[in-house]
Amino acid sequence: MVSEGFTKILLCSFCVGIALSANVSKSKAKFDNYKVLRVQIQDEKAQNYIANPDHEALYNVWAEPRINYTADIMVAPEKLKEITSGLSSNGLEYSTMIEDVQTLIELESTPITTEKDRSAGHPMTWTEYHSQEDMEAYMDYLVERYPDLVSIDDIGTSYEGRAMRVLKICKGGTCGQKPAMWIDGGIHAREWASPAVATFHMKELVENSKNYPSNLLDKLDWYILPVHNPDGYEYSRTDNRMWRKNRYFQNSYTKHQ
């Protein structure tokens, strides 16, 4: 069954994400004494309070507010008193989930890749986080080695001019004749595990397809965009580990995202 094979890939990719998420480098922006508060969202009033766009300058939302769940917000030390006072005055219960964000970042040990080891014909591994350049090199490698199965579509460029490339995996070399599966990663810049999982799907579907039911390629075309937000992703690697959005600015808005 297709679902059985896809589940197998998802389980493998989940393991990749878990392994990598414990291995993140330090970055230039510092978050000393930033705290993450976990807020109880009991009703629509609480949900609207946390989601209020006027509060964007006060805190950074890590987990979106949903009624009967919790929301996580990162707060700068100079804003903490104002935020906790506002939460209390509006009847919102909260607790401190992370005491110091910078300490958490520094506990993550393995660096992102800087050297290009191409002994395998490409620079990719799935034990470290890679640049968009490395991922594109891997995509080119797959096209060169598996031309009857793999091709690339350039679907546009980012605000800063980076390519947005989709890997197409279509058995027989012709896409569009079968139902399609779409996978993308890196919509939120700081979530590095998702591009790693997207490229892991590439590897498993193309290089290790014999390990899965043939239906995955016989019955489906696959389209994989590893980095949906390349500008933000690279910025989170080089400057600000907590950056979430893209790099398009309006009205000189430059706060932590």
Regions found by a protein language model. Name each.
Residues M1, I83, G161, V166, ...:
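Structural signal for hydrophobic/aromatic residues that build the beta-strand cores
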Residues S3-S21:
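Cleavable N-terminal signal peptides of Sec/SRP-targeted secreted and luminal proteins
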Residues A22-M135, L220:
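Intrinsic-disorder/low-complexity accessory segments
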Residues G86, N90, Y138-R145, H201-N208, ...:
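Structured segments of extracytoplasmic/periplasmic soluble domains
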Residues M97, S151-G156, N211-N215:
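Surface-exposed patches in mature extracellular/periplasmic domains of secreted proteins
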Residues S109-E115, L167, D239-R241:
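Short, surface-exposed amphipathic charged segments that create phosphate/polyanion-binding patches used
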Residues T127-I183, M242-Q257:
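Soluble metallo-hydrolase cores and metallopeptidase-like ectodomains found primarily
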Residues Y159, T174-Q257:
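Active-site/substrate-binding loop(s) of hydrolase catalytic cores
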